[in-house]
A protein has these predicted regions:
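Divalent metal-coordination and catalytic microenvironments
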Residues: 58, 72, 82, 96, ...
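Active-site metal-binding motif and surrounding structural segment of the metallo-beta-lactamase
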Residues: 76, 87-170, 174-176
């Protein structure tokens, strides 16, 4: 066999080996066709159940109480933003007491390395301290699912006003303070006259503000707390609550993640007020990296969000508002606007055809607050031409 023939034979043998290896590898890698399945949706909480989630620092969120509730727990006591609906009062109070007990246990003083006399007179005196009381309840709006638990939470809390005390100092305590915008108290008081739905006095706000903002006069649980009025948004008495140290904002009903916002036209709400409120929240917030993270926000309903979520929500509402506004300027009727489907791009994420707040109700509220349905203003009469 010549040298050329040997080389050709070797190359042929190598090619045959490679082809066989490729065929065997392909047989080994043969798998069933790939199939894709949709991940199951997050299960909703069973009715009447409350879920506690940590937000940041000493702040927690309660879900399932009718409205989302933000709870601050610390050395100064307990503060709640909103009180849920009336039927959930006992479970809300149980969740708050659980958080307070856990905080007290985590912050028990460590054993002191001093003499026995000091340990018995100092440490033991604090280890048995009871859980901290509820000091404040903030109402972000007038709705029943936000103020329903006011009475029970107020009566379970304590406010020490100082002054002369005869006897036990605990006897001088009042219930927890309830803070809200003045319009909330005005509307609740107006609906609390003689009648079946009258609210007891303990369910009404004890302190109100009527300016642009209100801040506590002192730190509470290590941070400043401010209430800021959002005029004519969901209603005319909406507030957001800004926890400055932990950088968390309780939004109330100016946003509902996963749903269009409820605009209560009868109580002064408007689409422009909602958009303005969201713009103000975005100005207050700070992102951590590339529009993500940073300031955390708890809306009145739905999951927690950050400033990127709020900006997307604001943009969505602005687009819908501008579409409806253009139709109003063309003197289109409400039925024509609904038929034009101005929310169509977003209905899969935010829309609803049933329940307490539907897509049609949202479109109608936007339409009305933009002046839709009002008779067009009469054109000014022309002056008669002067005779020459």
């Amino acid at each position: 066999m010549t040298r050329r023939a040997r080389i050709a034979s070797t190359i042929g043998a190598l090619a045959a080996c490679i082809a066989g290896a490729i065929s065997l590898h392909a047989q080994q890698r043969t798998v069933a066709p790939t199939t894709f399945t949709r991940a199951p949706m997050i299960q909703a909480l069973p009715p009447g159940e409350i879920e506690i989630l940590p937000v940041r620092g000493n702040l927690y969120a309660l879900f399932g109480a009718g409205s989302n509730i933000v709870v601050s727990v610390g050395a100064d006591g307990v503060m709640l933003v909103d009180a849920g609906k009336a039927g959930m009062g006992d479970k809300i109070l149980a969740a708050v007491q659980q958080l307070s007990r856990e905080w007290t246990k985590r912050n028990e003083p460590k054993p002191l390395g001093w003499g026995a006399e000091t340990r018995s007179s100092v440490a033991d005196r604090h280890i048995t301290a009871p859980p901290k009381p509820i000091r404040y309840v903030m109402n972000t709006t007038v709705d029943a699912d936000h103020i329903g638990g006011n009475e029970k939470l107020r009566n379970a809390g304590r406010t020490f006003t100082g002054g002369n005390v005869a006897g036990d100092i605990r006897d001088s305590a009042e219930g927890a303070a309830i803070l809200a915008h003045e319009n909330v108290l005005t509307r609740l008081a107006a609906s609390s006259g003689e009648g079946q739905n009258a609210l007891p006095s303990d369910a009404l706000p004890t302190d109100t503000y009527f300016e642009e903002a209100y801040k506590l006069s002192h730190y509470f649980n290590g941070e400043g707390v401010r209430l800021l009025h959002m005029p004519n948004a969901h209603t005319d008495g909406d507030s957001i609550v800004y926890f400055r140290g932990t950088d968390v904002i309780a939004l109330g009903d100016i946003m509902s993640s996963g749903a269009y916002p409820v605009i209560d036209v009868a109580k002064g709400g408007s689409i422009n007020g909602i958009v303005d409120a969201l713009n103000r929240v975005i100005d207050l917030s700070q992102t951590e990296f590339r529009l993500e993270g940073g300031t955390l926000m708890v809306p009145g309903h739905g999951r927690m969000v950050d400033s990127a979520d709020v900006a997307y929500y604001r943009d969505m509402l602005t687009i819908i508002r501008d579409r409806v506004d253009a139709m109003v300027k063309k003197n289109m009727t409400l039925e024509q606007v609904v038929a034009a489907n101005p929310t169509g791009d977003y209905d899969t994420e935010y829309g609803s055809t049933s329940g307490p707040w539907t897509t049609r109700q949202f479109i109608e509220a936007v339409y009305k607050t933009l002046g839709g349905g009002k008779p067009a203003a009469a054109a000014p009469a022309k002056r008669p031409a002067r005779k020459p």
